Structure formats: C-alpha cells, structure tokens
Amino acid sequence: MSEFPFEISPMFEGERVRKEGMFVELGGPKSLGLELVRAKPMDEIEDGKVTIVGPDLKDMEEGKTYPWAMIFHVGGELVEPDLESVIERRVHDFINYCQGIMHLNQRYDVWMRISKDTAAKMDSFEPFGKAVMMLFKTELPFIEKMQVTFYTDQAEVEKQMAEAMEIFKARDARTKDLHDEDVDVFYGCTLCQSFAPTNVCVVSPDRVSLCGAINWFDGRAAAKVDPEGPQFAIEKGELLDAKTGEYSGVNEVAKKLSSGEFDKIKLHSFFDAPHTSCGCFEVVGFYIPEVDGIGWVNREYQGMAPNGLGFSTMAGQTGGGKQIVGFLGIGINYFYSPKFIQADGGWNRVVWLPSMLKEKIDEAIPDDMKDKIATEKDVTDIESLKTFLKEKNHPVVANWAAEAEEEEEEEEEEEEVAAEAAPMMMPAAGFQMPAMPAMPMMSGGAGGIKLTFKNAKITIDRMIISEKKEKK
C-alpha cells in the first residue's frame, strides 16, 4: 500500500527476521515485551492517534534490544471488555502482515524484530502503528475507533507490565468454575497456522490456548462477532474417553484442519495423541525417562533443565504443529486446570520446574507436592534429580520398583523360553535336519543389544526378512 513505507499482505505471515538482517529487537528473551488491548468509551479515544513514549525508531542503535509495550485502546458500539483478549490475539496476525516486521508470542512474552530493509524506509514507529490500526478496522469492522501507545522507555514498560499482569490474572480467573463437561461447544483457533500449518488449537473450559491468550469465554466472544475469523466453534460431540479428554467432534476437526496428518487429539493426555504444539506456547513439558517423570520449562527461563536442554532447544523439538510424544506445549493457565495431564498422573508425574515458574504457579500446585518438585536450585542433572526424588519420596519413585520387577520378570521369561527351546533344537540320533538358511540371533547372555519397550505403540505395515548372502 503506497501510503506506508513497507508492503502489507498476508503473504508476509511466517516471515522471519534473522539476527543478521535485524535492525533492532523489541522485547523478547533479553528484555520486556508486552501487548494489551483495552476497551474504552468512544469519546475517550482519538481515532488513529499514535503516541511514542521513549526512544523512537530513529533514535535506536542498530543491533540493540529495547523494552517494548503496545497498548491499544479500542471503541465501538459492539466493543465490550469480553472482546479484549480476542482483539489482542489478532495483533500477532496483523503485525506479521507488515513486510520486514516479525512478531512472536503474546501478552507479556512479545518478541519483535524490525529488519534493516524496513528500518531504512521509515524512521518512526508511527506509520507502523497506523498500518496495524488500519488492518484492525478493515478486518474487524465492529472496531469504530482505535489509538495506540508504544512504550520503549524501561521504567514506563515496567509500569505498564505490572498493570497488565493484574488484568491478565483477572481474565484468566473467569473459567475457574466452568469445566469441559458443563458445555456442548469448545472453540478452535488457527492463528498460528502461518507458522505451524498443521496446528489445531482446541480451547475448552479446562484447557486454555497454548499461547495463554484465549480462554473458552474469549473463543465464544470471537466466534460471535467474527464468524469467519480464526476462532470458531467446535461441537465437542461424543465423549470417547473421560480420562484423556477425547471427543469425537475434536477428532473430526483435528483431521480436517491438519489435512489428515492427525486423526485424534486427547486434550488431557501427555503421551497418547497429545494436543499439537504450535510455537507460541508459554511452557514446554518434557518427559524424563530416567525417573519416569515430567518436567516443565517456561519461555522466560534462561537456564538448562536436568536433561541438559534449554527452552529454545526443546521448543524447536516441540513446535511446528506436530504431536511429539514426550514433549508438549501448553499455556500457563493449564497448570490450574483440575484436568491437568490427568491421563498421565497429573501433578503426581511432575518432577521439575524452574524456580521462577514454580513461584508463579504456586497456587496451582497441590500442597502435598510442593516440596517434592525440584527446581534448578535443588538439582543440576538427572542423577541429582533421582537423589532428590528419593529423599522426598516423590510418587514416581514407587513406579521405579514396579518397573524393576517387570524387567526381572521379563528376563526370567526370556531364560525360561531359551531353556525350553534348547532341547527342541537338538536333532534325534540318525535324523538329518533339512538345510535352512542361517539367521544369526542375539541372546541376552551373548552380547549384542537388548531393547525393552514400555507403553510403546509400534505399527509395522510390512516386514521382510531375507538371508544376507556373502559377496564372492
């Protein structure tokens, strides 16, 4: 569009601004990043106004990272507070329509980059602000008036962040007494499909969106005012499994929106057909097989988990709209759900959290589990985690003894089978065994590799066993 110094089109969704092509970074893991939408009476809004508090783009140094907050005020006859989260989540959409401007995450985790090419064409955030507001009013016509304030001053961003956190907390509390079984309709969201094409985000009363920005009430409000938008109703259909949270209606939508890649999603399962993970999730869950437990790491945590991996590495393994068994992306508010990974033990399966996350969700953790979940202050690796869990008598420790007994029983069974099979392989005197191709086998006592699969699902379409012939 000629009135703006950069191109605007949905084709730029998914565009990444790499570090080498970046002019400045706003928010992200090295600083503070915030976006917030507030509904206001129309007489309190100056339509189209852009205010900048702190250094403008022309005052910034190339390659630097700056704190960032975007506060949008919106008004209209149909605009109400219930729509704030819905409008807010579209910020991600519309900013990514702008060429050379990358936007990731949401709420208090915003991460943006302005490319060198785009920065060379504009010296202020004002045209950027006007472009985003133009897109909002075009795509969401119920918004009649809109203004925005950009904050790049550290003290001001900190102030806005503190106020916003209270607003987010109040929003999240609305679904506390509403549960999956109380409603007939869930809601879906496809906002992240530009980055994760097969992601199917399902929002139920007991499961907030992966980004944490959309709860069940937000989905309902969005589908009502924008029926053709990215949030839509899902008839939950027949309850197939109450423990895992499997519904026929969700499975149908999963198959359709993933183009057939997935045929089921179980809302409260960690291992079996888990919810897909996009890339905007607030927390990554990861299985630790050595202790048969699950750890969780949040986006803000900069250290390493006991498995030796950080958030960014595990997020790369988890995201992309896939079902990755052993990893799971979630929104922070899901920790407060009474159905939190209930198919796989719930809080009794959680063994590790970063201390900052543990403090943040303290009210969600059952009292009898608080001192049994380790943090980076307690353990540094798998061995120290094992020791900690034993000392605290964590529920997963009871599973270790059961697993050891299973392994012993399996070994005994293998020995019995081998002993029974041995006489059968000895030919009777004078009897000539027919010649058969030799097939080398490995036994537990003769070296080689032993593989033990537990709770594994293996599908083999076809197996061919043939004799390996020596080359002459």
From Swiss-Prot:
Its EC number is 2.3.1.169. Gene3D superfamilies: Bifunctional carbon monoxide dehydrogenase/acetyl-coa synthase(codh/acs), Chain M, domain 3, Bifunctional carbon monoxide dehydrogenase/acetyl-coa synthase(codh/acs), Chain M, domain 5, Carbon monoxide dehydrogenase alpha subunit. Chain D, domain 4. It catalyses: Co(I)-[corrinoid Fe-S protein] + acetyl-CoA + H(+) = methyl-Co(III)-[corrinoid Fe-S protein] + CO + CoA. This is Acetyl-CoA decarbonylase/synthase complex subunit beta 2. Its cofactor is [Ni-Fe-S] cluster. It comes from Methanosarcina thermophila. Part of a complex that catalyzes the reversible cleavage of acetyl-CoA, allowing growth on acetate as sole source of carbon and energy. The alpha-epsilon complex generates CO from CO(2), while the beta subunit (this protein) combines the CO with CoA and a methyl group to form acetyl-CoA. The methyl group, which is incorporated into acetyl-CoA, is transferred to the beta subunit by a corrinoid iron-sulfur protein (the gamma-delta complex). SUPFAM superfamilies: Prismane protein-like.
